[in-house]
């Protein structure tokens, strides 16, 4: 059933109908369309379009339809309705007859779809926050279990300074915490109800839009009808958050792939998140992490597509805006799947503590400690930096670590070096000295873990 047609003397060509119809993807808004319709029916009672009895009859029928949708949402796809709004109205008329035709009074599909997608996005934000928080909890638990796992920290993918695997985990806790808070901010901004804005100029019925907004779970009604039906900021914002969070997930996945490589051998991924080769029997591939990394471009592509769609649109609604749904549906589904998969990767992750420690002892990652040691002996830092650089070159030529050099060897470069140098060159000393807030010292990492556990409890 089309919601329009009186203006036309010819039926739409099937090719155009197939091109124009959106039910194949906007069926996902069925529950929200029904919820919005129930709210609108109550608003129509207050302006004497519906009687109380008629509203009760409509609400009962809509609730019955809601149960049917929840039991088998895919059944909607068997229909040839133009969109989800047409489908809901058609099914309502099947249940209550001509009374169902009164429900659209004062309402446009423009404000109808605007409220539907906002209701859907609000619900997805809640679900996404639950998934992100669950990932954070798993990272914190992994951190708690790996506080003694010393490993190299990297800059430019070169060994830089010793850290712990726990400190690495907690870095991602912070990244995902920002993603979580961005979702909260986005939720607050989208928590305004556009229903009652009509096609663009507002509704001709004196609907109490603030009451309607509260009935539908919004904080308040939107302030401008033209903006209300044109606004897709919340979709762009969620796509932006999803893209940034996917970038965080991709970095997590890339680290895991590197750590899992035969050259590093820092971690072993579970058989349950890896796959093999059809040719090479020995292979155990980190496919879960590679797919997270690969899907990141897909989500970012949805953001780019949406921005390009909106950038040239005049006010108010244009059919281009129908293109908002497939991108946001796919991007948020992909994001949530990747968050959940990253959580699964952590479930049975094994950290090779001996191997990480062995790697941390290589690469002269204690060179900064030697520079700080010279500073403590009165050498200006810029001079100590140069001295240590020369010392490292010497150690490389001799095939030694800094901690393996003798005092006479050290004193070729600085006379201030004494026997106390060896203590500060140990891995434990390297960690312990980084004791400012946010540092890698075991004490600070333990505090960060405890604080996060309390926050996420």
Curated annotation (Swiss-Prot):
**Which catalysed reactions does the entry list for this protein?**
2-(N(omega)-L-arginino)succinate = fumarate + L-arginine
Identify a single GO molecular function assigned to this protein: argininosuccinate lyase activity
> Where does this chain mainly localize?
cytoplasm
Question: Hydrolase among the record's keywords?
Answer: no
Q: In which pathway does it act?
A: Amino-acid biosynthesis; L-arginine biosynthesis; L-arginine from L-ornithine and carbamoyl phosphate: step 3/3
The UniProt entry, under Gene3D superfamilies, shows: Fumarase/aspartase (C-terminal domain) (1.10.40.30), Fumarase/aspartase (Central domain) (1.20.200.10), Fumarase/aspartase (N-terminal domain) (1.10.275.10)
For whether the record's keyword set contains ATP-binding, the answer is no
The name this protein carries in UniProt is Argininosuccinate lyase
Origin species: Haemophilus influenzae (strain PittGG)
Q: Which gene encodes it?
A: argH
């Amino acid at each position: 059933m089309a919601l329009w047609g009186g203006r036309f003397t010819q039926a739409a060509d099937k090719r155009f109908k197939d091109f124009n119809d959106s039910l194949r993807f906007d069926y996902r808004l069925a529950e929200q369309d029904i919820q919005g319709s129930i709210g609108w029916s109550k608003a129509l009672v207050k302006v004497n379009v519906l009687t109380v009895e008629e509203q009760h009859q409509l609400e009962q029928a809509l609730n019955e339809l809601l149960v049917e949708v929840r039991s088998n949402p895919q059944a909607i796809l068997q229909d040839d309705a133009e969109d989800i709004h047409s489908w809901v109205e058609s099914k309502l008329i099947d249940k209550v007859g001509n009374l169902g035709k009164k429900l659209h009074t004062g309402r446009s599909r423009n404000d109808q779809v605007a409220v539907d997608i906002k209701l859907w996005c609000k619900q997805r934000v809640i679900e996404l926050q639950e998934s992100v928080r669950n990932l954070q909890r798993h990272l914190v638990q992994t951190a708690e279990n790996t506080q003694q796992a010393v490993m190299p920290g990297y800059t430019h993918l070169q060994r830089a300074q010793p850290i712990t695997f726990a400190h690495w985990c907690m870095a991602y806790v912070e990244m995902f915490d920002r993603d979580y808070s961005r979702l909260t901010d986005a939720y607050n901004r989208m928590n305004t109800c556009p229903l009652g804005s009509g096609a663009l100029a507002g509704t001709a019925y004196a609907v109490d839009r603030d009451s309607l907004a509260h009935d539908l779970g919004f904080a308040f009604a939107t302030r401008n009808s033209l903006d209300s039906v044109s606004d897709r900021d919340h979709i762009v914002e969620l796509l932006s958050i999803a893209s940034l969070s996917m970038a965080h997930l991709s970095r997590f996945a890339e680290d895991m792939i590197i750590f899992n490589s035969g050259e590093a051998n820092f971690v072993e991924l579970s058989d349950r998140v890896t796959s093999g080769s059809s040719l090479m029997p020995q292979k155990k591939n980190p496919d879960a992490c590679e797919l997270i990394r690969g899907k990141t471009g897909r989500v970012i592509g949805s953001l780019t597509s949406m921005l390009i769609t909106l950038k040239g649109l005049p006010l108010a609604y244009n059919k281009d805006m129908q293109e908002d749904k497939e991108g946001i549906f796919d991007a948020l589904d992909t994001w949530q799947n990747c968050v959940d998969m990253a959580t699964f990767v952590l479930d049975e992750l094994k950290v090779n503590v001996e191997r990480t420690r062995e790697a941390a002892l290589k690469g002269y990652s204690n060179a900064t400690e030697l520079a700080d040691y010279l500073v403590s002996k009165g050498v200006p830092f810029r001079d100590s930096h140069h001295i240590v650089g020369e010392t490292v070159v010497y150690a490389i030529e001799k095939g030694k670590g800094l901690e393996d050099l003798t005092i006479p060897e050290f004193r070729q470069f600085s006379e201030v070096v004494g026997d106390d140098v060896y203590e500060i060159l140990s891995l434990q000393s390297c960690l312990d000295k980084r004791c400012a807030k946010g540092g890698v010292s075991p004490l600070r990492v333990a505090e960060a873990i405890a604080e996060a556990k309390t926050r996420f409890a």
